[in-house]
Amino acid sequence: MAEGQIIKALSGFYYVLSEGKVFQCRGRGVFRKQKVTPLVGDRVVFTATGEAEGYILEICERQNELVRPPVANVEQAILVFSAVSPDFSAKLLDRFLVLVESKNITPVIVISKIDLLDGGMKETIAQYVRDYRHIGYEVIETSTVTKEGLDELMSHLCGRVSVVAGQSGVGKSSLLNALRPDLQLKTGDISTHLGRGKHTTRHVELLAIAGGLVADTPGFSALEFDHIELDELPYYFPEFRAYGEGCKFRGCLHVAEPKCAVREAAEAGDIAPYRYDHYLSFVAEMKERKPRY
Protein backbone atom coordinates (compact mmCIF):
# COMPACT_ATOMS: atom_id res chain seq x y z
CA MET A 1 0.00 0.00 0.00
CA ALA A 2 1.08 3.56 -0.68
CA GLU A 3 -0.21 7.10 -0.17
CA GLY A 4 -0.72 9.74 -2.83
CA GLN A 5 -2.92 12.59 -4.01
CA ILE A 6 -5.49 12.59 -6.81
CA ILE A 7 -4.44 15.15 -9.43
CA LYS A 8 -7.03 14.30 -12.11
CA ALA A 9 -10.32 12.39 -12.35
CA LEU A 10 -11.61 11.33 -15.75
CA SER A 11 -13.99 8.63 -17.05
CA GLY A 12 -14.00 6.64 -13.82
CA PHE A 13 -10.23 6.74 -13.42
CA TYR A 14 -8.36 8.64 -10.74
CA TYR A 15 -4.80 9.71 -11.45
CA VAL A 16 -2.82 9.51 -8.22
CA LEU A 17 0.51 11.28 -7.77
CA SER A 18 2.79 9.38 -5.42
CA GLU A 19 6.52 10.05 -4.98
CA GLY A 20 6.80 11.76 -8.35
CA LYS A 21 4.96 9.03 -10.27
CA VAL A 22 1.35 9.01 -11.53
CA PHE A 23 -0.82 5.88 -11.13
CA GLN A 24 -4.09 5.41 -13.03
CA CYS A 25 -6.44 4.04 -10.36
CA ARG A 26 -10.02 2.92 -9.97
CA GLY A 27 -12.03 3.38 -6.80
CA ARG A 28 -13.31 0.43 -4.79
CA GLY A 29 -16.98 -0.49 -5.15
CA VAL A 30 -17.47 0.30 -1.48
CA PHE A 31 -17.16 4.02 -2.29
CA ARG A 32 -20.26 3.79 -4.51
CA LYS A 33 -22.18 1.93 -1.81
CA GLN A 34 -21.23 4.59 0.73
CA LYS A 35 -22.04 7.31 -1.84
CA VAL A 36 -18.54 8.69 -1.48
CA THR A 37 -16.92 10.18 -4.58
CA PRO A 38 -13.15 10.62 -4.61
CA LEU A 39 -12.27 14.21 -5.51
CA VAL A 40 -9.28 15.79 -7.16
CA GLY A 41 -7.06 16.88 -4.28
CA ASP A 42 -8.01 13.92 -2.09
CA ARG A 43 -5.16 12.26 -0.25
CA VAL A 44 -5.65 8.53 -0.65
CA VAL A 45 -4.26 5.13 0.30
CA PHE A 46 -3.93 2.90 -2.77
CA THR A 47 -2.39 -0.37 -3.85
CA ALA A 48 -0.47 -0.67 -7.10
CA THR A 49 -1.54 -3.50 -9.41
CA GLY A 50 1.09 -2.79 -12.06
CA GLU A 51 3.79 -0.33 -13.04
CA ALA A 52 1.32 2.56 -13.32
CA GLU A 53 -2.09 1.18 -12.28
CA GLY A 54 -3.78 0.64 -8.97
CA TYR A 55 -6.89 0.66 -6.77
CA ILE A 56 -7.83 3.33 -4.25
CA LEU A 57 -8.50 1.69 -0.89
CA GLU A 58 -9.15 4.65 1.37
CA ILE A 59 -9.82 8.38 1.17
CA CYS A 60 -8.09 10.28 3.96
CA GLU A 61 -10.03 12.89 5.94
CA ARG A 62 -10.50 16.10 3.97
CA GLN A 63 -9.25 19.44 5.25
CA ASN A 64 -11.89 21.18 3.13
CA GLU A 65 -13.97 20.65 0.01
CA LEU A 66 -15.07 23.00 -2.74
CA VAL A 67 -18.14 22.37 -4.88
CA ARG A 68 -17.24 24.59 -7.83
CA PRO A 69 -14.69 23.44 -8.82
CA PRO A 70 -14.99 20.01 -7.13
CA VAL A 71 -11.62 19.82 -5.40
CA ALA A 72 -10.53 18.86 -1.88
CA ASN A 73 -7.69 19.82 0.47
CA VAL A 74 -7.04 23.23 -1.03
CA GLU A 75 -4.42 24.97 1.11
CA GLN A 76 -4.48 28.45 -0.38
CA ALA A 77 -6.41 30.63 -2.80
CA ILE A 78 -4.48 32.97 -5.07
CA LEU A 79 -6.91 35.89 -5.43
CA VAL A 80 -5.92 37.80 -8.56
CA PHE A 81 -7.21 41.37 -8.91
CA SER A 82 -5.88 43.81 -11.47
CA ALA A 83 -4.72 47.29 -10.52
CA VAL A 84 -6.40 48.64 -13.67
CA SER A 85 -8.26 47.31 -16.70
CA PRO A 86 -10.52 46.17 -15.10
CA ASP A 87 -10.26 48.55 -12.16
CA PHE A 88 -9.43 47.15 -8.74
CA SER A 89 -12.60 46.19 -6.84
CA ALA A 90 -12.14 46.08 -3.07
CA LYS A 91 -15.75 44.97 -2.53
CA LEU A 92 -15.37 41.96 -4.82
CA LEU A 93 -12.05 41.14 -3.16
CA ASP A 94 -13.73 41.27 0.26
CA ARG A 95 -16.43 38.88 -1.01
CA PHE A 96 -13.76 36.44 -2.14
CA LEU A 97 -11.91 36.81 1.17
CA VAL A 98 -15.06 35.91 3.15
CA LEU A 99 -15.66 32.83 0.97
CA VAL A 100 -12.04 31.72 1.25
CA GLU A 101 -11.90 32.27 5.03
CA SER A 102 -15.16 30.31 5.43
CA LYS A 103 -13.55 27.27 3.76
CA ASN A 104 -10.47 27.34 6.00
CA ILE A 105 -8.25 28.26 3.05
CA THR A 106 -5.37 30.74 3.31
CA PRO A 107 -5.82 33.66 0.90
CA VAL A 108 -2.95 35.29 -0.97
CA ILE A 109 -3.92 38.58 -2.65
CA VAL A 110 -2.20 39.14 -5.99
CA ILE A 111 -2.54 42.56 -7.63
CA SER A 112 -1.73 42.21 -11.32
CA LYS A 113 -0.87 44.69 -14.08
CA ILE A 114 0.92 47.10 -11.75
CA ASP A 115 3.09 48.20 -14.69
CA LEU A 116 -0.02 50.01 -16.03
CA LEU A 117 -0.38 52.21 -12.94
CA ASP A 118 0.27 55.93 -13.13
CA GLY A 119 -0.35 59.06 -11.08
CA GLY A 120 -3.15 58.99 -8.55
CA MET A 121 -4.06 55.35 -9.18
CA LYS A 122 -0.60 54.32 -8.03
CA GLU A 123 -1.19 55.86 -4.59
CA THR A 124 -4.76 54.47 -4.43
CA ILE A 125 -3.50 50.93 -4.99
CA ALA A 126 -0.59 51.50 -2.58
CA GLN A 127 -3.12 52.44 0.13
CA TYR A 128 -5.16 49.26 -0.50
CA VAL A 129 -1.94 47.23 -0.27
CA ARG A 130 -1.11 48.86 3.08
CA ASP A 131 -4.64 48.27 4.39
CA TYR A 132 -4.78 44.58 3.53
CA ARG A 133 -1.26 43.93 4.79
CA HIS A 134 -2.17 45.69 8.04
CA ILE A 135 -5.08 43.26 8.47
CA GLY A 136 -2.57 40.43 8.09
CA TYR A 137 -3.12 39.32 4.52
CA GLU A 138 -0.27 38.41 2.21
CA VAL A 139 -0.29 40.84 -0.75
CA ILE A 140 1.90 40.41 -3.85
CA GLU A 141 2.12 43.09 -6.54
CA THR A 142 2.85 41.55 -9.94
CA SER A 143 3.46 42.32 -13.59
CA THR A 144 3.92 39.76 -16.35
CA VAL A 145 5.59 42.54 -18.37
CA THR A 146 8.30 43.56 -15.88
CA LYS A 147 8.24 40.14 -14.09
CA GLU A 148 7.86 41.95 -10.75
CA GLY A 149 6.47 39.75 -7.98
CA LEU A 150 6.67 36.48 -9.95
CA ASP A 151 9.45 34.98 -7.82
CA GLU A 152 7.51 35.83 -4.66
CA LEU A 153 4.37 34.22 -6.10
CA MET A 154 6.33 31.08 -7.05
CA SER A 155 7.61 30.77 -3.48
CA HIS A 156 4.00 30.78 -2.23
CA LEU A 157 2.93 28.09 -4.70
CA CYS A 158 5.81 25.76 -3.83
CA GLY A 159 4.72 22.69 -1.86
CA ARG A 160 1.05 23.72 -1.64
CA VAL A 161 -2.26 22.94 -3.35
CA SER A 162 -3.76 26.18 -4.65
CA VAL A 163 -6.76 27.46 -6.54
CA VAL A 164 -6.64 30.68 -8.54
CA ALA A 165 -9.65 32.99 -8.36
CA GLY A 166 -10.61 36.56 -9.20
CA GLN A 167 -12.70 38.63 -11.58
CA SER A 168 -12.47 37.97 -15.31
CA GLY A 169 -9.89 39.81 -17.38
CA VAL A 170 -7.42 40.31 -14.54
CA GLY A 171 -4.66 38.17 -16.05
CA LYS A 172 -5.01 34.82 -14.25
CA SER A 173 -3.99 32.84 -17.35
CA SER A 174 -1.16 35.27 -18.14
CA LEU A 175 0.24 34.82 -14.62
CA LEU A 176 0.22 31.01 -14.84
CA ASN A 177 1.76 31.15 -18.33
CA ALA A 178 4.54 33.38 -16.98
CA LEU A 179 5.26 30.82 -14.26
CA ARG A 180 5.07 27.84 -16.62
CA PRO A 181 5.19 28.91 -20.30
CA ASP A 182 4.58 25.42 -21.71
CA LEU A 183 0.97 25.59 -20.45
CA GLN A 184 0.11 28.08 -23.21
CA LEU A 185 -3.20 28.92 -21.56
CA LYS A 186 -5.36 31.21 -23.65
CA THR A 187 -6.28 34.52 -22.13
CA GLY A 188 -9.82 34.47 -20.82
CA ASP A 189 -9.96 30.76 -20.00
CA ILE A 190 -7.62 29.08 -17.56
CA SER A 191 -8.85 25.70 -18.76
CA THR A 192 -8.60 25.88 -22.56
CA HIS A 193 -5.64 23.52 -22.69
CA LEU A 194 -8.03 20.70 -21.82
CA GLY A 195 -9.71 21.18 -25.19
CA ARG A 196 -13.17 21.68 -23.77
CA GLY A 197 -16.07 22.51 -26.03
CA LYS A 198 -18.90 24.58 -24.61
CA HIS A 199 -20.96 21.51 -23.74
CA THR A 200 -18.30 19.02 -22.70
CA THR A 201 -18.17 17.73 -19.14
CA ARG A 202 -16.09 19.96 -16.95
CA HIS A 203 -13.37 18.36 -14.93
CA VAL A 204 -10.63 19.77 -12.82
CA GLU A 205 -6.95 18.92 -12.88
CA LEU A 206 -4.08 19.86 -10.60
CA LEU A 207 -1.17 21.23 -12.61
CA ALA A 208 2.43 21.10 -11.40
CA ILE A 209 3.56 24.73 -11.22
CA ALA A 210 6.52 26.16 -9.28
CA GLY A 211 6.89 23.06 -7.12
CA GLY A 212 3.23 23.04 -6.09
CA LEU A 213 -0.13 21.94 -7.50
CA VAL A 214 -2.56 24.48 -8.96
CA ALA A 215 -6.16 23.74 -9.97
CA ASP A 216 -6.65 24.52 -13.65
CA THR A 217 -10.24 25.66 -13.11
CA PRO A 218 -10.99 29.05 -11.52
CA GLY A 219 -11.94 28.67 -7.89
CA PHE A 220 -15.09 30.04 -6.26
CA SER A 221 -17.16 30.38 -9.42
CA ALA A 222 -20.20 30.63 -7.11
CA LEU A 223 -19.98 33.84 -5.10
CA GLU A 224 -23.05 33.52 -2.87
CA PHE A 225 -22.82 33.29 0.91
CA ASP A 226 -25.38 30.45 1.06
CA HIS A 227 -23.30 28.22 3.34
CA ILE A 228 -22.44 31.00 5.81
CA GLU A 229 -24.61 31.85 8.82
CA LEU A 230 -25.13 35.52 9.65
CA ASP A 231 -23.49 35.24 13.07
CA GLU A 232 -20.38 33.73 11.42
CA LEU A 233 -19.78 36.67 9.09
CA PRO A 234 -17.91 38.92 11.59
CA TYR A 235 -15.38 36.14 12.14
CA TYR A 236 -14.41 36.30 8.46
CA PHE A 237 -13.35 39.94 8.85
CA PRO A 238 -10.16 39.25 10.86
CA GLU A 239 -9.60 42.86 11.95
CA PHE A 240 -13.01 42.83 13.72
CA ARG A 241 -11.88 40.12 16.15
CA ALA A 242 -9.62 42.36 18.23
CA TYR A 243 -12.46 44.84 18.80
CA GLY A 244 -15.38 42.38 19.07
CA GLU A 245 -14.43 41.47 22.64
CA GLY A 246 -15.11 45.09 23.62
CA CYS A 247 -18.72 45.14 22.40
CA LYS A 248 -21.36 45.56 25.11
CA PHE A 249 -23.55 42.72 23.85
CA ARG A 250 -22.44 39.16 23.34
CA GLY A 251 -23.15 38.05 19.76
CA CYS A 252 -23.05 41.67 18.58
CA LEU A 253 -23.50 41.83 14.79
CA HIS A 254 -21.75 45.23 14.65
CA VAL A 255 -24.61 46.89 12.78
CA ALA A 256 -26.78 49.09 15.00
CA GLU A 257 -26.20 47.70 18.49
CA PRO A 258 -25.32 50.26 21.20
CA LYS A 259 -21.71 50.45 22.43
CA CYS A 260 -20.38 48.40 19.52
CA ALA A 261 -16.57 48.52 19.63
CA VAL A 262 -16.24 47.46 15.98
CA ARG A 263 -18.45 50.28 14.72
CA GLU A 264 -16.56 52.74 16.93
CA ALA A 265 -13.24 51.49 15.50
CA ALA A 266 -14.54 52.00 11.95
CA GLU A 267 -15.72 55.53 12.81
CA ALA A 268 -12.28 56.28 14.31
CA GLY A 269 -10.53 54.98 11.19
CA ASP A 270 -8.88 52.06 13.02
CA ILE A 271 -10.82 49.74 10.70
CA ALA A 272 -10.81 50.77 7.03
CA PRO A 273 -14.24 52.43 6.48
CA TYR A 274 -14.75 50.69 3.12
CA ARG A 275 -14.22 47.29 4.77
CA TYR A 276 -16.91 48.09 7.33
CA ASP A 277 -19.23 49.36 4.57
CA HIS A 278 -18.74 46.11 2.64
CA TYR A 279 -19.48 44.16 5.81
CA LEU A 280 -22.78 46.05 6.28
CA SER A 281 -23.66 45.37 2.64
CA PHE A 282 -23.01 41.63 3.09
CA VAL A 283 -25.12 41.58 6.28
CA ALA A 284 -28.02 43.19 4.40
CA GLU A 285 -27.62 40.69 1.56
CA MET A 286 -27.68 37.74 3.95
CA LYS A 287 -30.74 39.05 5.79
CA GLU A 288 -32.65 39.18 2.50
CA ARG A 289 -32.03 35.57 1.49
CA LYS A 290 -34.82 33.05 1.84
CA PRO A 291 -34.80 30.99 5.04
CA ARG A 292 -33.39 27.47 4.78
CA TYR A 293 -35.25 24.52 6.28
Swiss-Prot record:
Residues covered by the CP-type G domain: 63-223
Leading EC class: hydrolase
Family according to the record: Belongs to the TRAFAC class YlqF/YawG GTPase family. RsgA subfamily.
Function: One of several proteins that assist in the late maturation steps of the functional core of the 30S ribosomal subunit. Helps release RbfA from mature subunits. May play a role in the assembly of ribosomal proteins into the subunit. Circularly permuted GTPase that catalyzes slow GTP hydrolysis, GTPase activity is stimulated by the 30S ribosomal subunit.
Subunit: Monomer. Associates with 30S ribosomal subunit, binds 16S rRNA.
UniProt keyword terms in alphabetical order: Cytoplasm, GTP-binding, Hydrolase, Metal-binding, Nucleotide-binding, Ribosome biogenesis, RNA-binding, rRNA-binding, Zinc
Cofactor(s), by name: Zn(2+)
Organism: Geobacillus thermodenitrificans (strain NG80-2)
GO cellular component labels: cytoplasm
Amino acids binding Zn(2+): 247, 252, 254, 260
Cofactor-binding details, from the entry: Binds 1 zinc ion per subunit.
Classification via Pfam families: RsgA_GTPase, RsgA_N
Principal subcellular localisation of the protein: cytoplasm
Name of the protein in its database record: Small ribosomal subunit biogenesis GTPase RsgA
Subcellular location: Cytoplasm
Binding locations of GTP: 112-115, 166-174
EC number(s) recorded for this UniProt protein: 3.6.1.-
Molecular function terms from GO: GTP binding; GTPase activity; metal ion binding; rRNA binding
The organism's taxonomic lineage, starting at the top: Bacteria, Bacillati, Bacillota, Bacilli, Bacillales
Keyword Hydrolase: yes
Keyword GTP-binding: yes
An annotated GO BP: ribosomal small subunit biogenesis
